[in-house]
Amino acid sequence: MSAKTDEILESLKTLSLLEASELVKQIEEAFGVSAAASAGVVMAAPGAAGAGGGEAAEEKTEFDVVLESFDASAKIKVLKAVREATGLGLGDAKAMVEAAPKAIKEGVSKDEAEALKKAIEEVGGKVTLK
């Protein structure tokens, strides 16, 4: 790199997040470009922290398994499935099941989430993946 680009880079490293955001807006206006195309490079850290809109296009890798409801006659079976999946004690698992809709597990892989969903639905629970 040239001395000029090194100097610019060092200046950019000292910017706060708010200042960097303002700089991006000014660059977009001055050059008639959009930072959305290069968001993966320029906005990598903020995108990871503020997930949402950007992730809609990408396939999710982490899921929350949420027990929405269950058949009253299947409460004990659902309770056993939740205990097995979470490793919770009887009292904690019972409280979790009775608090439905309630997240049973959060941030699990797609395979694990689907397996847990299948196990709970087989015994009478209604589960969604978020």
From Swiss-Prot:
PANTHER family per UniProt: 39S RIBOSOMAL PROTEIN L12, LARGE RIBOSOMAL SUBUNIT PROTEIN BL12M
GO biological-process terms attached to the record: translation
Keyword Ribosomal protein listed: yes
Keyword Ribonucleoprotein: yes
Keywords: Ribonucleoprotein, Ribosomal protein
Subunit record text: Homodimer. Part of the ribosomal stalk of the 50S ribosomal subunit. Forms a multimeric L10(L12)X complex, where L10 forms an elongated spine to which 2 to 4 L12 dimers bind in a sequential fashion. Binds GTP-bound translation factors.
Highest taxon in the source lineage: Bacteria
Biological role stated in the UniProt entry: Forms part of the ribosomal stalk which helps the ribosome interact with GTP-bound translation factors. Is thus essential for accurate translation.
InterPro entries: Ribosomal_bL12 (IPR000206), Ribosomal_bL12_C (IPR013823), Ribosomal_bL12_C/ClpS-like (IPR014719), Ribosomal_bL12_oligo (IPR008932), Ribosomal_bL12_oligo_N_sf (IPR036235)
A GO CC term attached to the entry: cytosolic large ribosomal subunit
Name of this chain's protein: Large ribosomal subunit protein bL12
Family label: Belongs to the bacterial ribosomal protein bL12 family.
MF terms (GO), sorted A to Z: mRNA binding; structural constituent of ribosome
Name of the coding gene: rplL
